[in-house]
Amino acid sequence: MKSFTQRYLKLFTLVFFIGITYFSYGQEALLTERMESFPTYSFGDPNPLPAFLFNTKIYPYHKFQGYAFEKTEAPLKKIILENQWIEVQVVPEVGGKVWGATDKSNGNEFIYKNEVAKFRNIAMRGPWTSGGIEFNFGVIGHHPGTGTPTDYKTEELPNGDLLCTVGGIDLPSRTQWRVKIILPKDQSAFTTQALWYNPTDIEQAYYNWMTAAAAAREDLVFYTPGDRYLTHGGEAKAWPVDPLNRDLSQYKQNNFGPSKSYHVVGEYNDFFGGYYEQNNTGFGHWGRYDEIPGQKLWLWNLSRAGGIWEDLLTDTDGQYVEYQAGRLYVQYFPGEENPISQATFDPHLTDQWTEVWFPVKEIG
């Protein structure tokens, strides 16, 4: 078996290749906006009162209290960005999230695409769906707008690239956010360009993580450079091999204990991702380390306790993992002690950064 270093150096070579190499065979990129009849477990029953008592951090939002256990067909608007190599789906009505992305050469979903909108009471305001890439801006995740409509705009750029911009206002912090989802006409990768602005005269809470999902399979190996991982409270632990000689970078060796949060640190690198060794496909993320240093892996526990959430969040697409990229090294969590505390967003400050998401194949 290849060493952990050998594995991620090979992934780095692929990232570098994607970053400098362009392909063009004259085929046009295609942008489609369509309404689909989509299998949906809906949500509703809004509390008529804002969140005065149960969670003051999300005031003035209210909470949704009703979640369907019967599936219906409901209209869902999708924005499809497609070139010769990949297809990216965006759903403005569900937090503006990237719903999924597929490598057209082999059908690999390098961003997990859920074939059902199964809303469950997980986010700060309640409704949340698994899969895709969730854009979190504000006080803490999963932010209040992750299950409700955002503004959006689509464009075909003069150079032939495709653009879908999503965004909105986080009412608790009064900050404004935008994400440009760009599919170049001649690359097997897409880009997200984020802009976040604090228009107020006071400090606001600062929390940003881009939460992507991938399929959870026994042959999945994570390429996450580092030699330690941080807990939510800031405690450093060994990575990837723990004191019991379990290689935590192998999904199947996480078959112990509760669900896992690994904030991996200790290497100055711009990329991370994962690879499925049996079918030689995978997924990757690139972002400048000085812009987005956080790299987190979230795994539901591999026992039936995690399987319950698979049943709650999808019908046929199986369990997923999350690979998250963040502006900070570790996610603040209420109740944890220092050194991890809530970061602040200075008055009238604007932050911008760029990330690239791409499929991987045949590098095993």
Segments predicted by a language model, with ranges:
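Bacterial Sec-dependent N-terminal signal peptides
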Residues: 1-28
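Short N-terminal segments immediately surrounding and downstream of signal-peptide cleavage
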Residues: 27-43
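A contiguous, surface-exposed recognition patch within enzymatic or periplasmic domains that forms
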Residues: 35-40, 79-82, 88, 94-100, ...
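Extended, loop-rich substrate-binding clefts of extracytoplasmic carbohydrate-active enzymes
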Residues: 47-74, 78-82, 130-188, 218-219, ...
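Short, surface-exposed, low-complexity cationic segments
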Residues: 93-107, 170-172, 360-363
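Active-site-surrounding "flap" and adjacent substrate/cofactor-binding loops of secreted or lumenal enzymes
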Residues: 105-124
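Core domains of carbohydrate- and sulfate-ester-processing enzymes
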Residues: 124-135, 139, 231-243
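Short, hydrophobic/aromatic-enriched beta-strand segments in well-ordered soluble domains
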Residues: 168, 194-196, 349-362
